[in-house]
Amino acid sequence: MEDDQCYKDVGESIAVIGMSCRFPGTATSPQGLWEMIKNKNTAWSEIPPDRVNMDGFYHPDGQRQGSISFRGAHFLLQDLARFDAAFFSVTEEEAKAMDPQQRLLLETSYEAIENAGLRIEDLGGSDTSVFVGSFVKDYEQVSLRDAHYQPRYAATGTGNAILANRISYFYDLQGPSMTIDTGCSGSLVAIHQACETLRHGESSIAFAAGAGVILTPNTMMPMTALNFLSPDGRSFSFDARANGYGRGEGVGFVVLKRLTDALRDQDPIRAVIRGTGICQDGRTPGIVFPSTKAQVSNITSVYHKAGLSFDQTAYVECHGTGTRAGDFVELSAVAATLAANRPQDSPIIVGSVKPNIGHLEGAAGVAGLIKSVLVLEKGVIPPQANFMTGNPRVDFQEFRLKVPTDLCQWPLPGLRRVSINCFGFGGTNAHAILDEAEFHVKGQRPPSIGRLATVAETEEIMVEEDSATPLPQLFTFTSPDQQGVVRIMHQYADHIRDTLEFKTTEDLNNLSYTLNCRRSQFDWKGYVVANTQEELAETLDSTDVDKAVRSKTRPHPKIAFLFGGQGAQFPGMGSELFYRFEVFRSSLEAATEYLLEHLGSQFNLLTEILRIQDESVIHKPSISQPATTAIQMGIVDLMKACNVHPSSAVGHSSGEIAAAYACGMISREDAWTIAFYRGACAEQMSIRLSGPRCQGLMCAVSMSEDDMRGYLSRESVSDTIQVACINSPKSVTISGDASGIRLIAAELKERDVYHRILDVPVAYHSYHMKYVDSEYKACLQDLPMDFCPGIAPMFSSVTGSRMELGVQSSRYWADNLTSPVLFSDAMKIMLQESHPDLLLEMGPQSTLRTSIADILDDMFAGRRINLAPRYVSAMARGNNETYSVLSALGELWSYGCNVDMQGLVKK
C-alpha cells in the first residue's frame, strides 16, 4: 500500500481544475451549494404550476394509475426558457427546439472552462473529450406531443447523443464525445470514462457532466408506480423516515486534466482524483435491487488499483437515495470496506447531498463530486440535512459509521481523502476516490504561486518587490457585446468590494493574472489599471459603456512605433519602469555597462537617469542623448517581451536611432554607440567653440512650414535661424542662435502664436551642427556598412521616404544630426504604405501627440473617423509610468493585438 508522506508518482492521478453547477434553490454555483449544505438548508418546494398542474395528477395512493403521490420536489429557480442563444451561436429557431438540458450544459460548460482558467480559443481543434450522464428526456416528450406542431430542429434539439455532442461542436473539440445513461450513476460513470481517456492518452483535457430537468408528469408516474419516489417529495438519507427519494433537477460540470499536466500548466487544482471504477450488479432479486456484494467489490477494486488503503479516507459521499433497502445495502458495503478496520470511537463519516438538492438522477454523481471537492477544500464536513433518527436496519455503531448532524472538523490527521459512491437503478455502480489538492501541489510549485499563476517557463518581465507595496496592475475584461463588458466590470466591482479576498498586492496580482491570461477573448474589450482594492472597485464602478471598444476585425492589427527626439528628457525618467519591469531594467543596465566598458563613458548612465531633480544633469547633451535613446530602447524591449512588435516605425530626429533598433536594422550596441557619440559631439561643439553664435536653442511653433519660412525671410534671419523640423502641416521647430530664437519667441508671444522653447542647449538641425559633422562621422566609422532590411520597414525623417539603404552608415547618422527633420512627410508616406491600425509612441513623454493629431486630421479629414489609426502613448510625463505602460498595453489589447500578458504579473 501507499506511504502518503512519500507520495511521488502522480502519473495516473487526475486533477479537477474547474467546476460549475446549476442546482436547485440557491445552489446555483459551487459556493452557493456550500452555503446551502453548510447550513443544512434544502431546496424543496411545491411543484410549480408552470411545470405540472398537480391538481390534475396528485393522489395520495401512488398505485393509482396516472397519478403522482407527492406535491413537491427540488427545482431550479431560474426560468428555463431564458438562454443566451447568440453567445452559443444558436439561432432562435434552434433554441426553441433545444432541450433545456442542452442549454444548461452549454452555460455551465463555459463557467467551468472559466473556472479552470482555460480559454475557448485554445480549446478549438484539441483532443478534449466530453462525457455527459443523462437519465430523463422530458423535453422530447413535451415538444413532440403534438405530431402536427413539432419543432423543425427537434431531432438535434432533443437527441440524447447531442447533450455531449453539442458541447464538442460549439467548442470544436475533437476527442471522444458521448452521452451515458446508466440511470442515477450516469454522471459518475461519465467522470470515470473521462478519467480513463486521460489515463490512456486519448485526451489532454476531459469534460464530465450530468444533467436532468423536470418538465412533465409522464416521467414521474412510472417511477411512482415502482415506489421509487418519496410521497413527501424529499430524500431522508440514512433516516428512519426514508420512504423513497425526492426528485431534483440541475446540471453539474467538471473539467479534468492529468495531474502532471495541470501542475505543468499551473492550473487551479481543486482536488485530485486518485481512482475511479465501475461495475455491474449482475443478477439480483430484481433488476432495480442494488447489490452489497457488487458495491463491496467495486470499492475494493478501485482502492486496490490506486494502491491505496482505506485508512486515510475520512468521509464517504454516498448515493444515499433515501430508500430503506437502498441505504442499507450501500451502508453495508461501506461498513465492509472503508469502515471495516475503524476503531468504534473513530467511525467513518457518511453523508449525501440529496436531502439538500434532491436526487438529480443523471446529475447525481457529479453533484456528489462537486460537494466532495468543496469538503476537501474547506477541511470541514457539513451536517446531514433531513436526518433525525438513523435507519433502524443499520447498526451505526457496529458498522462504525457516523452521520454528522453539525458542521464537524476533519477527523483524521494528514492528507484529506474522501470517497464517492453511486449506483444506478439498472445495476451499474460507480466509485471515485478524491484527495485534497494541497498535498499533491506542495513542493511542485514556487511558494509565491497563487491559485492561478503564470507558466513557469515564461520570461520574467517583472522585478520582485515587497508584496506589501501596492503595485499598479492591469485588469482586462471581455464580452461578446459592448454592454456586457461594462456589466462584467460592475459585477467585479461589487465582488471586490464585498469580499475579503483582495486585501493584498498578491491577491490583486492573482486576479490580474486570471483576467489577463486565463480568460477567453471576445470582440468587445475594456481594461482598467489600479493598485489597490479600493481604487480597482471605484474605477470599475465608474466605467461607462464608451470605455468598451470593439477589436479590429483584422486578426493581427498593425502597430507603427513612433519615437520622439531630443527635448523629452527629464530627471528620473524611466525610474518607475526600472523598479517594476525586469526586461526594462536589464535593458538599461546593459546600456550602462556597454557605455562604460566599450565606449569609455565618463559617467554612469543609470546613475544619471535615476538622479533626483536637484542633482540631475540630464539636460546635458552628452547625457540626455544616450539616456533618451536607452529609455526608448528599453520600452521597445518591454513591448517585444509582451509580443508587441512594430509593423513599421518612424523616428523624429534622434528618435530614428531607437526606430532603427526596433525595426531590426541596427544592433542594440550600434544604437547605443550612435546615441552616445551624437550627444558627445553636440556637447563638445558648445564647449570648444566660443561666441554668441555658438549658443543654440530650439523652439517648437504652431505654424506651417511655408508660413514660417516666409516669416524668417521677412525678418532677414534665415541665415542664423532655420526650419529644423517639419513636425506636421501645422507645426514646425526652428533652430539656431539662442539670441535670435528668444527674439522670435517674444514676437510670437505678442502675436498669440503658440510656441515652446525646447529644453535643449544645442541648435540641432541648424548650421551649428556643421561644426561637428566630420567628427561625428569619424566616431561612427566602425559601424557595419551592409544594409540589413530588418523585421519591419522604417520610414526616414531624413529623406521623408521609406528607408531603403544607408541606415548602417555614418553618413546617414551625420545627416540625421544636421539635416531638417521631415517627420510630417515620413509619417504620411508610412500611413499610405503601411496602413497601421495603431500608432504607439515610445519615449519618456508623448511629445508627438499634437503633431500626429494634425497629420491625421490632414490625411483623414472628411473620411469616416474609424479609418484613421488610433494613437497610443507608452509614457506621459506627470503620469505614473507603470500606469502609462500598462494602459498602453491595455489599449493595444483592446484593439485586438495579441499582447502576451504572462509576464506582467508577479510570480
Residue ranges, per PLM feature:
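Active-site machinery of serine-nucleophile hydrolases
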Residues: 563-611
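Acyltransferase
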Residues: 275-276, 280-286, 538-539, 544-547, ...
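Flexible catalytic loop/linker elements that gate and position reactive groups at enzyme active sites
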Residues: 19-22, 41-42, 290-305, 419-559, ...
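Flexible, low-complexity linker/boundary loops enriched in proline and small hydrophobic residues
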Residues: 17, 67, 71-79, 405, ...
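Short Gly/Thr/Asp-enriched flexible loops that form oxyanion-binding sites at enzyme active sites
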Residues: 325-333, 845-862
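Short, low-complexity connector segments at domain boundaries
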Residues: 1-22, 58-59, 64-66, 80, ...
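Short beta-alpha connecting loops at secondary-structure transitions
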Residues: 148-152, 180, 235-243, 280-286, ...
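Condensing-enzyme catalytic core of the thiolase-fold
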Residues: 2-461, 616, 637, 667-670, ...
